[in-house]
Amino acid sequence: MIKQQIEELRQLLRHHEYQYHVLDNPQIPDSEYDRLFHQLKALEQQYPEYASENSPTQRVGAKPLSNFAQVKHDIPMLSLDNAFSDEDFFAFVKRIQDRLIHVHHSLTFCCEPKLDGLAVSILYINGQLVQAATRGDGTTGEDITANIRTIRNIPLQLLTDNPPTRLEVRGEVFMSQAGFEKLNKTALAKGEKTFANPRNAAAGSLRQLDPKITGQRPLMLNAYGIGIAEGVELPDTHFARLQWLKSIGIPVNNEIQLCHGIEKVLDFYRTIKQKRSSLGYDIDGTVLKINDIDLQQQLGFISKAPRWAIAYKFPAQEELTILNNVEFQVGRTGAITPVAKLEPVFVAGVTVSNATLHNGDEIARLDIAIGDTVIVRRAGDVIPQIIGVLHERRPENAKSIIFPTNCPVCDSVISKIEGEAVARCTGGLICAAQRKEALKHFVSRKAMDIDGIGAKLIEQLVERELVHTPADLFKLDQVTLMRLERMGAKSAENALASLAKAKKTTLARFIFALGIREVGETTALNLATHFKTLEAFENATFEQLQKVQDVGEVVAKRIRSFWSEPHNVAVVKDLIAQGIHWDNVEVKEVRDNPLKGKTVVLTGTLTKMGRSEAKEYLLQLGCKVSGSVSSKTDFVIAGESAGSKLTKATELGINILSENEFLALLA
């Protein structure tokens, strides 16, 4: 009897939460909801044997965390490409039409406001909320389950009698403008720090280690899509899927529309742009998605984004300010970037005091001088940049901006390759500015993987002039390391052990670690597999380099430029002298095998070897390794938790190999 009463109260409260938070249709006064809530809470305290973690009373109350655990996304949470004009949008549509030449009807889009919040993934197992994570880098996020459970419009249990066995909801967590203003008002009254804008407030609230604090913040969710779905037959359009989510208790934005044809899509964009200030929450554009799921799957993905969706951003907010000075920064590859030092100005929710001027060509194009009144905007509402100059306001004491001829850090000559806008320092690894970033790249996980040497340690080593080249890292001793801040005997021992371990590597990792421009992890692997030895790679001609898979004229020029610098050659020789070595890449003719000459895609997690090792084996089998599935793909090797690539391969009828079947080919 009591158990039934408790469950009925829970169902009643869930119903009213859904009516209030999702449908915006409250059916009872807040006071009545509070009465029911406290009645349930009292019964649960009196009868703890009937407690449930998914009860409406359990949204707040988990213990504070010491840190956030990592969560790997089974299906990557990709970002979106951007459009900033009608022309950009038309180009996006043309790319779609070029790929869908068999589709003769006009395209239908699901159009949504682009909320300015944080992307999250929420996993339901048999209808129960079991895990939530941030987007993170798209592959791995942070576990924020306890905090997500405190958000009132997110159901802890799906409102359906027949829930999917597994459902991953993806959406945006945000804060309304009214909630933001109230939060800041309360903070001011308490003498606490305020937030600059609703997005920062939402981010700070969602990443609180104490869920009780998150529970006091006015956060909301709007779902925009589905990741994993098992035990359910989903509708075949994006719009219908969002409506289905809404029917089972997941909040969806009320402004979403189905638009048939390009003009209707542009009408939606213009309408939302006009309504922007009256929506009650921050948006920075619209998201435009092909509605038909089958067409989405045919279009597929590029490396970081779907081909079937685009974010059409609103024009960035702009303000006037004064250019006080220009400083020239040096990046890891020697790129010289002019940075405008501005009179601080509030733009799009943040105070801007620096802005990029990109390069010397941009300075000339703008005809900008120190002392000018300039128009600054946050491109995409993120990166501040100067887009114009009010020349009529130029003061008499304005000073011309002189692009340096020598590096501001090491005084080496600055050069500019014909056809490139970027000027670069020629100092290579003798330039301290490049040195820090080059060393950080050298020790990184995908390069030499020296986990005992972190970014802060490298900064100390460079600033104290203890390390000038990567080879100097291997000359460090315990006494030297212990003189550095926060380096005791144990830390020094760990660092030296990491360095010793890193001396055994692979040719591919070593090439990648050198930081040659345009030579990424995959290209380094292709180079190592093709040339077999460092000597052959070093002496390869421009023409020989272009015979390597994925190496064109530009990459070949970068490689030859690297080896033509005596300083770089000296550093490489020193590294070898310090004991860097690797197993020989066997020079043997590719034996006949089912994968020879085929295009292969890896997906999922391999349990018996790393992804890089698997790529290396595939190249040795004479394969071309691709990062995406298409009609040109011959085989897909599927490890654990294989996601969208496996799904697409199945739909296209592509041959799929398990990890064990792949290993059998290597035997």
UniProtKB/Swiss-Prot annotation:
Q: Which GO terms describe its molecular function?
A: DNA binding; DNA ligase (NAD+) activity; metal ion binding
Does Manganese show up as a keyword for this record? yes
For this record, the Gene Ontology CC terms, alphabetical, are:
cytosol
The catalysed reaction is:
NAD(+) + (deoxyribonucleotide)n-3'-hydroxyl + 5'-phospho-(deoxyribonucleotide)m = (deoxyribonucleotide)n+m + AMP + beta-nicotinamide D-nucleotide
The entry's NAD(+)-binding residues are 30-34, 79-80, 112, 135, 172, 289, 313
Q: What class of enzyme is it?
A: ligase
InterPro entries per the UniProt record, alphabetical: BRCT_dom, BRCT_dom_sf, DisA/LigA_HHH, DNA_ligase, DNA_ligase_AS, DNA_ligase_CS, DNAligase_adenylation, DNAligase_N
Identify which residues the record assigns to the active site: 114
Task: Determine the domain of life of the protein's source.
Answer: Bacteria
Q: Which keywords appear in this protein's UniProt record, sorted alphabetically?
A: DNA damage, DNA repair, DNA replication, Ligase, Magnesium, Manganese, Metal-binding, NAD, Zinc
| Disulfide bridge partners, by residue number | none
Please give a single GO biological process term from the UniProt record: DNA repair
Residues annotated as binding Zn(2+) are 407, 410, 425, 431
The record's section on Pfam families has: BRCT (PF00533), DNA_ligase_aden (PF01653), DNA_ligase_OB (PF03120), DNA_ligase_ZBD (PF03119), HHH_2 (PF12826), HHH_5 (PF14520), Nlig-Ia (PF22745)
Which Enzyme Commission number(s) are on file for it? 6.5.1.2
UniProt cofactor(s): Mg(2+); Mn(2+)
Q: What does this protein do?
A: DNA ligase that catalyzes the formation of phosphodiester linkages between 5'-phosphoryl and 3'-hydroxyl groups in double-stranded DNA using NAD as a coenzyme and as the energy source for the reaction. It is essential for DNA replication and repair of damaged DNA.
- Name the PANTHER family for this protein: CHROMOSOME TRANSMISSION FIDELITY FACTOR 18 (PTHR23389), DNA LIGASE (PTHR23389:SF9)
Q: What is this protein called?
A: DNA ligase
Taxonomic lineage from the root: Bacteria, Pseudomonadati, Pseudomonadota, Gammaproteobacteria, Pasteurellales
